[in-house]
Amino acid sequence: MPNHYRISKTVDGTKTYQLWDNDRVVSEFDSELNMKINYRIGTNGQVLSDSKENLYSYDGHGNLVNGKDNSSTTVYDVYGNKTEDIGIGDAPFGYCGEYTDSESGFVYLRNRYYDPSTGSFITEDPIKDGNNWYGYCAGNPVNGWDPSGLFGENT
């Protein structure tokens, strides 16, 4: 399965580089390649902590639910919209533990971006499988997820 890892992004003229390992961002660097943050990945592939001393925990669907000292809470609806956010702030790993761009709210799934506000991808399926090339998890995110942006999987 191909993966199209994004190696950098530019927001308001500021470039950030990303280093990936096993489908996870493990480090981010500024435009001069100074490390901004480093993430520690657990054996299950989820981000456990970062170099800023934040600790993360997840629910059964892989959604980030607690930050730093477990006094913060985030709750998502089935499509990935935050319904409650107390204290996690700008942690980039949210819905299904996937990298979420704070600027757009889009979830980066390696091959496509997912928009929780519409429950669909913002570009058509590059494989062009099925009838709805923008659909996320065949409209059933309770029982599935799509970590690659190419095809849904049962959770």
Explain the meaning of each model-derived region.
Residues 1-5, 15-24, 36-45, 54-62, ...:
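Aromatic-rich beta-strand edge motifs centered on tyrosine
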Residues 5-10, 24-30, 46-49, 63-68, ...:
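Beta-strand elements of repeat-based all-beta scaffolds
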Residues 52-110, 134, 138-151:
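A motif-centric feature for acidic-aromatic and gly/ser/thr-rich catalytic loops and repeats
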Residues 13, 129, 140-142:
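Acidic glycine-/aspartate-rich tracts in secreted/extracellular proteins
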